[in-house]
Amino acid sequence: MCMPCFTTDPNMAKKCRDCCGGNGKCFGPQCLCNR
C-alpha cells in the first residue's frame, strides 16, 4: 500500500500512480502498487 485513496479527489488515481512510481491504482480505500 502506497497511500490512502479518497474517492472525493478527482486526481487521486494520478496521485496513486505517482506515489507508486507510475504503476499503481486505487483499490477501495487503498492505493496499491503493481510490482
Swiss-Prot record:
Tissue specificity: Expressed by the venom gland.
Top-level taxon of origin: Eukaryota
Keyword flag Transmembrane helix: no
Modified residues (Arginine amide): 35
Family membership: Belongs to the short scorpion toxin superfamily. Chloride channel inhibitor family.
InterPro entries: Scorpion_toxin-like_sf (IPR036574), Scorpion_toxinS_Cl_inh (IPR007958)
UniProt protein name: Insectotoxin-I5A
Protein's UniProt keywords contain Disulfide bond: yes
Compartments where located: Secreted
